[in-house]
């Protein structure tokens, strides 16, 4: 039986895939980072679990704007 956190992580990752395939091409590719924020989100959720992975993804998305002074290789 799959645990609730693992099931939730799979659902979130599927939603990110839907965004990557269905929505991102319409909006255009504007991510300033070398690994896109959506791919970073998938990797973070897989590596850190759903809570920490989603938190790290939210922080990353908040940094994804042209006025961020950090480099773009994160």
Curated annotation (Swiss-Prot):
Name the record gives this protein: Putative membrane protein insertion efficiency factor
Function: Could be involved in insertion of integral membrane proteins into the membrane.
Entry keyword annotation includes Membrane: yes
NCBIfam families: membrane protein insertion efficiency factor YidD (TIGR00278)
Pfam families: YidD
Provenance organism: Blochmanniella floridana
Taxon lineage: Bacteria, Pseudomonadati, Pseudomonadota, Gammaproteobacteria, Enterobacterales
InterPro entries per the UniProt record, alphabetical: Membr_insert_effic_factor_YidD
PANTHER family in the record: MEMBRANE PROTEIN INSERTION EFFICIENCY FACTOR-RELATED
Entry keyword set: Cell inner membrane, Cell membrane, Membrane
Recorded topology in the membrane: Peripheral membrane protein
Family classification: Belongs to the UPF0161 family.
Listed GO CC annotations: plasma membrane
Subcellular location: Cell inner membrane
The keyword Ligase is annotated on this UniProt entry: no
């Amino acid at each position: 039986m799959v645990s609730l956190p693992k099931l939730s992580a799979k659902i979130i990752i599927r939603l990110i895939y839907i965004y990557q395939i269905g929505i991102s091409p319409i909006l255009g590719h504007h991510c300033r980072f070398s690994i896109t924020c959506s791919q970073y989100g998938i990797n973070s959720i897989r590596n850190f679990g759903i809570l920490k992975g989603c938190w790290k993804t939210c922080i990353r998305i908040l940094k994804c704007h042209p006025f961020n002074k950090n480099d773009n290789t994160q």
